[in-house]
Amino acid sequence: MKQVQTKRDWKKLAYDVVEEKMITKEDAIAILEADDTEVLEIMNAAYIIRHHHFGKKVKLNMIINTKSGLCPEDCGYCSQSIISEAPIDKYAWLTQEKIVEGAHEAIRRKAGTYCIVASGRRPTDKEVNHVIGAVKEIRETTDLKICCCLGFLNEDQAGRLAEAGVHRYNHNLNTHANNYDSICSTHTYDDRVDTVQKAKQAGISPCSGAIFGMGETIEERAEIAFELQRIDADSIPCNFLVAVKGTPLEGQKELTPVECLKVLAMMRFVNPTKEIRISGGREINLRSVQPIGLFAANSIFVGDYLTTAGQEPTADWGMIADLGFEIEECAL
């Protein structure tokens, strides 16, 4: 006789989280391993947590790629790496004027946070000064929150960015520590954690997440969420691998839409009070179930990513309105 598996009470687990009871790693794994027929129940439960902390608000972020390609690191997922053969645009730093223009485009797209991103291992002091000049002008002329993602930082650079008015610094953990050597050999997992800590020590809000679907196990996928909890990331971008042709991970099997939804729900259960953003791979991996993702996440990027295209801002605005949600402008 076939044994009937007992279903979890996902709503009860959600209400436990609302009452500030932390879920276990076993609970997180159970979400990821749940039968696909349970995914709507899981997302409904995740929404209980999301609504408790964020209501119906959705935060919009916009990226500007201020320096593309030319990166000496060998991250296997990245089309900007020196080892990548992907046909992308490659250029040195945009002018401060272009960076400031991008901020005004972010406002037109109804974004509250503007993300200044540059490829490379770490910025020079001259490059940090270049960014600071743009940041100061943006701060003087807009109400945007500013996030930077410039690579590894030292204490002095982090302090100067904070003093200039940078609100948030992004440096993703990318994958589980056990999986890191298979993704990159030119720096370590601990190097990435160190930069997150330096930003936080400087008084900058830490943003750190991962790219799911790079060969990590289900258990490691859950442990990533708890590691992000441990380092106290305020904002958690959940990226889903796009196996770009010309990168070492070309051909890697990408996550299904349902697998992506389970990741988002699990992340909300583990990090209930944090901004969880559906990031790279949203349109490609989630496809027609993108709106369901916002029942767990409360943030998205609007417009294009670093080297891959996003959907039109009007499509994102429409998706948010159709859900009965509201855009939260100029909020970190």
Curated annotation (Swiss-Prot):
HAMAP family reported for this sequence: BioB
Gene: bioB
Positions with a binding annotation for [2Fe-2S] cluster: 115, 147, 207, 277
EC category: transferase
GO molecular function (one): iron ion binding
Domain of life: Bacteria
Catalysed reactions, semicolon-separated: (4R,5S)-dethiobiotin + (sulfur carrier)-SH + 2 reduced [2Fe-2S]-[ferredoxin] + 2 S-adenosyl-L-methionine = (sulfur carrier)-H + biotin + 2 5'-deoxyadenosine + 2 L-methionine + 2 oxidized [2Fe-2S]-[ferredoxin]
Similarity remark: Belongs to the radical SAM superfamily. Biotin synthase family.
SMART domains (alphabetical): BATS, Elp3
Oligomer and partners: Homodimer.
Protein's name in the database: Biotin synthase
Function, as annotated: Catalyzes the conversion of dethiobiotin (DTB) to biotin by the insertion of a sulfur atom into dethiobiotin via a radical-based mechanism.
Cofactor, free-text remark: Binds 1 [4Fe-4S] cluster. The cluster is coordinated with 3 cysteines and an exchangeable S-adenosyl-L-methionine.
Annotated GO biological process: biotin biosynthetic process
Origin species: Bacillus cereus (strain G9842)
